């Protein structure tokens, strides 16, 4: 199968306000979004953290829609840049690249395989890992990326992996250091997505 049959990629300019990106296609299956900031337009550092324009950032997503294949209504999603607690919440415009890809297991024309999964994180505590199995095993340990797909919790959040194998992996979320140091603090349940792929994809 050709990659373009179940996925598309692009770029856009976004900031710390929500932006809606409309895709070029509609999809029969639910889609996952993977996005990264590919520019660095932060301002001058300051010793006053609240005024510091140089800050860590994370992409937040919401309202991911696969579109409607019957009406040819394309898919879409909302995206913004988020800064951690204690920094100014306003971030300047940055270039972001994204991949929209349909859920499922896909065999490409070159023989490589990839799998896209969408699931809810069941643990709400910081740094508490949960196991996630692939739908079918890979022949070797695959490459793996994942991203939070919702913004049910408004605190800054990022994901960590460990014990990646041919059959699955473990994943945990981390909030910023202010929230994360409170080991008992909980984050609302979010929808997560992963993309696992053969070496050489």
List the model feature ranges, each with a label:
Residues 1-201:
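Extracellular receptor-binding modules and their adjoining Ser/Thr/Gly/Asp/Asn-rich linkers
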